[in-house]
Regions:
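Polytopic transmembrane helical bundles with strong interfacial aromatic enrichment
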Residues: 1-186
C-alpha cells in the first residue's frame, strides 16, 4: 500500500520529466549552418575528472527523488504518523539518502579538484553560482541524513525530516534549472 504510493510519486515525477523533455526538446532540429567537422569540445573540458563529475552530480540529484517520493507518500498516507509506519519509511529512505548524498559529494569534490588544477582559481571553491547550485542540495542532504538519524533513534524531527527530503530534491531541480537554462552564468 505505502510502496505503491511511493512508486506512484516516482511515476508522476518521471512523467513530468518526460513531458518537459517532449515539450522543450527536438532532437531532429537541424543546426544552421551545419557544422562540417563539428565544433569539438572545449579543451578545458577534455579531462578525466569531467568525464566522471557530471554523472556523479546527476546520480546525486536523481537519487534525492526517492526520499522525496517517500516523503510525499508519507504525507498522503494517514497511517504514516504511526510509530511503526514512521520506522518503516525511515528505514527505506535512509539508504537512498546516503547513496544520493555520496554521489553528490563525489561529484562536487571532482568538480572542485578540476577547477583547482585546470582553471587555477587559487582554491577549491570559488562560490560560483554553478558550484552553489550543487552545494545547496548537498547541505540539505547532510541535514536530512542527521534528521533521519534523530527521527529513527529518538522519534523527533518527523516533520522536519519530511521537509528536508522534499527540499533536497526541490533544490536539485532548481539548481539544475538555474545552471542549465542559462539564467545563471559561470
Amino acid at each position: 500500500h505505502f510502496s505503491a504510493r511511493v512508486l506512484g510519486v516516482l511515476g508522476i515525477v518521471s512523467f513530468g520529466f518526460l513531458l518537459f523533455t517532449l515539450a522543450t526538446s527536438n532532437p531532429f532540429l537541424r543546426l544552421i549552418p551545419a557544422a562540417v567537422d563539428g565544433s569539438d569540445l572545449n579543451p578545458l573540458l577534455q579531462d578525466f575528472g569531467l568525464i566522471v563529475h557530471p554523472p556523479m552530480l546527476y546520480m546525486g540529484y536523481v537519487g534525492f527523488a526517492v526520499p522525496f517520493a517517500f516523503a510525499i507518500a508519507a504525507l498522503l498516507d494517514r497511517d504514516a504518523s504511526k510509530p511503526d509506519e514512521v520506522a518503516r519509511w525511515l528505514r527505506w529512505t535512509r539508504p537512498w539518502t546516503n547513496v544520493a548524498w555520496g554521489f553528490l559529494t563525489i561529484g562536487i569534490a571532482l568538480g572542485s579538484w578540476w577547477a583547482y588544477y585546470e582553471l587555477g582559481w587559487g582554491g577549491y571553491w570559488f562560490w560560483d553560482p554553478v558550484e552553489n547550485a550543487s552545494f545547496m542540495p548537498w547541505l540539505v542532504g547532510t541535514a536530512l541524513i542527521h534528521s533521519l538519524a534523530a527521527t529513527e533513534k529518538r522519534g523527533v524531527f518527523k516533520s522536519w525530516t519530511l521537509l528536508l527530503a522534499i527540499l533536497a530534491f526541490s533544490l536539485s531541480l532548481l539548481g539544475t534549472f538555474l545552471v542549465r537554462s542559462g539564467v545563471l552564468t559561470s
